[in-house]
C-alpha cells in the first residue's frame, strides 16, 4: 500500500511469517490433519451464494497487518469466548486462514473439539492468497469501513472540516453537533457541546431534540465512516436541516488544535408521543424505500428450526434497555456498530439476520443499511417481546469447556500478602492497553495462546496466579497454565476489578512483558488518548485517513463485495 504506517507493519509481519515457516511445529502437524483449500478454490467459494465463515485466528495486532477482506478475526487466545456467538451453526462451512505460520491448525483442532464438523484451512494462508493475485487488506472491520466510504461516493454525502464547523460556531450560527459513537466512546472523549446520539438512534431521538430547521446539523465520530453514515442517515430520513459529516471526527478536531471534553454524559432524550410516532413513520418510509422486510414471530420460529441456515438474532437497543430485559435467544449489537462492524457480531456471510427493537425505529433504519451492505437477508421482527420470557443483565456467552473448569481461587488480600513475601507470580491476561494503564505491581503480561513462550521468561515461584478482566478467559488460562507448567496454579477471585476494589497498589506501564503486546491493533484514535499532539499521532491519523480513502478503489480491484447502493431518486 502507499501509506507507510501500514506498509512498515505489514513488512514486519511477512518477515516473521517467513522465519516461523522454517520451523516444524505441532501447529504444522495439526495444519495437515484438516482439509486444505487453495486460494483459487476459496475465491470461488466466496461468490457461490452459500454460507461461509472465513476465520483468521491470529492475534488482533497481527491480523490487522494483513488479511483477507472477508476474514473475521477470532484470536486463538479468546476463541472459546466468542465462537458460539459468532458461528452459531456447527455445520457451517468454515475456512481458517493465517499468515502461513500454522495458527490455523491449532484453531482447527479446537473447533473440532467444540463440535464444528466442516472445517478446512486455506493452504499457505494470506501469503498464498496474495501470491495468487488477490487483494490483501490491512486494518480492522475493513468491509464495514469500506462501505462507509462507498456510500459517500455514491450519495455525495456533504462533509465539513473541524475548522469550518468552528468558524460557524464562532460567528454565532446555529450549529448542533451530534456524536454518532456509542456512549462508552463518547464519555472517553468528545467535542465540546456535542450531544451523544449513536447512529442507530439518530432518527429515533432526533425529533425529540426539537431542532429548528435553520440549524446546521453536524455528525461526528472518531474518524470518518460512522459520521458519514450518520449524516447520510438523517439525509435519507428527509429531515429539513442542512446536514454534514465532520471530516476526520475527533481525530481531526484534535489535529486542528481544538480541545476535547472528557467524562461527559450528554445524550439525546428518548422520544415519546408525537415525536415517537414521527420517528416511526420516518423509519417506515426509509425501510420501504430500501425493501426492508418485517417478519412475524411465527416466521422467526421457522428460521430457528432451519438446520441448514445460520441465524443471528441481534438486539439493537441501548445497553441499559438490554440489561433490563432481553430475549434469551438474542445477542447484543448497537446500530451502525453492526453495519460497519458485522465482523464483531456475525462471522457467517450469507446468513440470516433478524434485528430487534421494541420501537422498531432503530431496527428499520439499521436494516435499511444492512441490505445495502451485502446482508440481503436482514429482517426486522415485529413485536419482538410479545409472549416471550425475558432474561436480565449483560449478554452471557456460552463458553465451551468453561463448565468443566474448577480452578483454585485466591482473594486479593491473600495474594497481596503472598506477593510481599515473594511467594507468588502473577500473570495478567487482560488486553495490553489495559495492562499498560494499570496492573498489579510485578504482574507479567501474557497472551494465553503463547503460554509456552511466556513461561520461558517468567521467574518461577511456588505459586502461579492468573488475573485479568474477563473471568472466563482467566479460568481458561489457569487451566492451560496448570497443564503446561505442572505447577500449582490459582486464579485471582474477581480478577483485576477485585484488586482495585480492595484499594491495593496499581502500577502503570509495560513493566513485565512475557509475550509481545500485539493482541490489539492500535488505531490512531487510541494513540490520541495518550499523546494527542505528538507528531506520531498526527502521522498515524493522516495515514489512517489515507487508508480509508483508498478502500473504494481497492474494493473495485478486489471485486469481492456486492454493495447495493443506489440514489434516493432511483428508489422512489
What residue ranges belong to the model's regions?
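Bacterial N-terminal signal peptides
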Residues: 13-27
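Rhodanese-like catalytic fold shared by cysteine-dependent sulfurtransferases
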Residues: 2, 6, 28-53, 60-176, ...
Amino acid at each position: 500500500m502507499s501509506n507507510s504506517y501500514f506498509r512498515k507493519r505489514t513488512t514486519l509481519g511477512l518477515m516473521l511469517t517467513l522465519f516461523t515457516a522454517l520451523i516444524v511445529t505441532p501447529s504444522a502437524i495439526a495444519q495437515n490433519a484438516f482439509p486444505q483449500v487453495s486460494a483459487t478454490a476459496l475465491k470461488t467459494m466466496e461468490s457461490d451464494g452459500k454460507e461461509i465463515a472465513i476465520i483468521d485466528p491470529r492475534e488482533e495486532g497481527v491480523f490487522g497487518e494483513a488479511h483477507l477482506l472477508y476474514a473475521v478475526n477470532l484470536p486463538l487466545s479468546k476463541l472459546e469466548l466468542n465462537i458460539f456467538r459468532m458461528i452459531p451453526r456447527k455445520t457451517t462451512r468454515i475456512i481458517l486462514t493465517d499468515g502461513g505460520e500454522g495458527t490455523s491448525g491449532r484453531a482447527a483442532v479446537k473447533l473440532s473439539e467444540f463440535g464444528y464438523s466442516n472445517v478446512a484451512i486455506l493452504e499457505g494462508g494470506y501469503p498464498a492468497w496474495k501470491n495468487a493475485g488477490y487483494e490483501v487488506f490491512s486494518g480492522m472491520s475493513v468491509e464495514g469501513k469500506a462501505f462507509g466510504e462507498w456510500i459517500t461516493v455514491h450519495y455525495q454525502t456533504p462533509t465539513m472540516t473541524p475548522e469550518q464547523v468552528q468558524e460557524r460556531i464562532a460567528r454565532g450560527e446555529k450549529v448542533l453537533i451530534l456524536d454518532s459513537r456509542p456512549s462508552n466512546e463518547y464519555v472517553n472523549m468528545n467535542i465540546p457541546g456535542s450531544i451523544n446520539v449513536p447512529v442507530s438512534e439518530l432518527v429515533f431521538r432526533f425529533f425529540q431534540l426539537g431542532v429548528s430547521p435553520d440549524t446546521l446539523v453536524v455528525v461526528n465520530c472518531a474518524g470518518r465512516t460512522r459520521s458519514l453514515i450518520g449524516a447520510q442517515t438523517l439525509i435519507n430520513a428527509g429531515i429539513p436541516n442542512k446536514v454534514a459529516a465532520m471530516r476526520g471526527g475527533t481525530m481531526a478536531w484534535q489535529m486542528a488544535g481544538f480541545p476535547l471534553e472528557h467524562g461527559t454524559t450528554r445524550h439525546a432524550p428518548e422520544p415519546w408521543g408525537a415525536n415517537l410516532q414521527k420517528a416511526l413513520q420516518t423509519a417506515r418510509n426509509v425501510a420501504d424505500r430500501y425493501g426492508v422486510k418485517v417478519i412475524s414471530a411465527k416466521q422467526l420460529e421457522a428460521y430457528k428450526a432451519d438446520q441448514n441456515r445460520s441465524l443471528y438474532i441481534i438486539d439493537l437497543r441501548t445497553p441499559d434497555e438490554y440489561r433490563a430485559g432481553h430475549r434469551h435467544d438474542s445477542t447484543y449489537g448497537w446500530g451502525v456498530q453492526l453495519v460497519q462492524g458485522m465482523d464483531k457480531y456475525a462471522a457467517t456471510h450469507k446468513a440470516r439476520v433478524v434485528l430487534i427493537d421494541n420501537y422498531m425505529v432503530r431496527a428499520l433504519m439499521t436494516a435499511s443499511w444492512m441490505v445495502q451492505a451485502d446482508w440481503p437477508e436482514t429482517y426486522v421482527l415485529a413485536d419482538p417481546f410479545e409472549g416471550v420470557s425475558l432474561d436480565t443483565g449483560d449478554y452471557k456467552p456460552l463458553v465451551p469447556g468453561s463448565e468443566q473448569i474448577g480452578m483454585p481461587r485466591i482473594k486479593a488480600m491473600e495474594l497481596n500478602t503472598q506477593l510481599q513475601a515473594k511467594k507468588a507470580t502473577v500473570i495478567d491476561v487482560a488486553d495490553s492497553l489495559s495492562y499498560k494503564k494499570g496492573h498489579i505491581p510485578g504482574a507479567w503480561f501474557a497472551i494465553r495462546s503463547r503460554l509456552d513462550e511466556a513461561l520461558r521468561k517468567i521467574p518461577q515461584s511456588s505459586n502461579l496466579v492468573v488475573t485479568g478482566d474477563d473471568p472466563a478467559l482467566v479460568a481458561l488460562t489457569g487451566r492451560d497454565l496448570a497443564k503446561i507448567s505442572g505447577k500449582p496454579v490459582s486464579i485471582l477471585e474477581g480478577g483485576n476489578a477485585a484488586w482495585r476494589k480492595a484499594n491495593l497498589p496499581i502500577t502503570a506501564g509495560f513493566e513485565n512483558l512475557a509475550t509481545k503486546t500485539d493482541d490489539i491493533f492500535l488505531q490512531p484514535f487510541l494513540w490520541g488518548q495518550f499523546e494527542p499532539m505528538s507528531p506520531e499521532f498526527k502521522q498515524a491519523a493522516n495515514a489512517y485517513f489515507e487508508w480509508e480513502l483508498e478502500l473504494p478503489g481497492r474494493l473495485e480491484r478486489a471485486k469481492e463485495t456486492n454493495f447495493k447502493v443506489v440514489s434516493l431518486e432511483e428508489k422512489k
